[in-house]
């Protein structure tokens, strides 16, 4: 079970993703604005943050920058419906865990990506903190 934060200005998509991850046993919080997301990132600890890139008030890239400036190392999966090479490069350079293009199979793709991420992160934590 992991603690996830899902950030997207499209509330219906947030609810769909929230339900999908809750069904898999995860604890899920959502934010439908960048400002709300910033407050949650600053006050809570998450295992993984999933954020849309293009939002009206604060972009997913800006949220990632904010987290890194605050020394928050939580992995980010950034997703977008309007992919560009420059945005992908910027996301990777800032340390995004993954960059995902929103497609018709977004829920399935994201669920699979999150499970892989959590396994990798678990393995990484075990190697950094041996028994």
Where are the model-predicted features located?
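Alpha4 helix (beta4-alpha4-beta5 surface) of REC/receiver domains from two-component response regulators
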Residues: 62, 83-100
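Short amphipathic alpha-helix used as the core "switch/output" element in two-component signaling
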Residues: 39, 61-72, 90
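The feature encodes the CheY-like receiver
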Residues: 14, 56
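Acidic catalytic/metal-coordinating carboxylates
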Residues: 32-36, 59-62
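Short hydrophobic/Thr-rich beta-strand motif most characteristic of the beta2 strand and flanking loop
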Residues: 25-32, 40
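Active-site residues of response regulator receiver
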Residues: 52
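Charged docking surfaces used in two-component/phosphorelay signaling
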Residues: 15-23
């Amino acid at each position: 079970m992991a603690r996830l934060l899902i950030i997207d200005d499209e509330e219906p998509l947030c609810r769909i993703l929230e339900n999908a991850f809750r069904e898999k046993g995860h604890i899920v919080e959502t934010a439908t604005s960048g400002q709300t997301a910033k407050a949650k990132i600053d006050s809570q600890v998450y295992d993984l943050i999933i954020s849309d890139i293009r939002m009206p008030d604060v972009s997913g890239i800006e949220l990632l920058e904010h987290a890194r400036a605050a020394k928050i190392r939580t992995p980010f999966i950034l997703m977008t419906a309007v992919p560009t090479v420059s945005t992908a490069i910027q996301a990777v350079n800032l340390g995004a865990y993954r960059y995902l293009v929103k497609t018709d199979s977004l829920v399935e793709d994201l669920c699979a990506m999150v499970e892989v991420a959590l396994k990798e992160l678990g393995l990484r934590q075990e190697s950094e903190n041996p028994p």
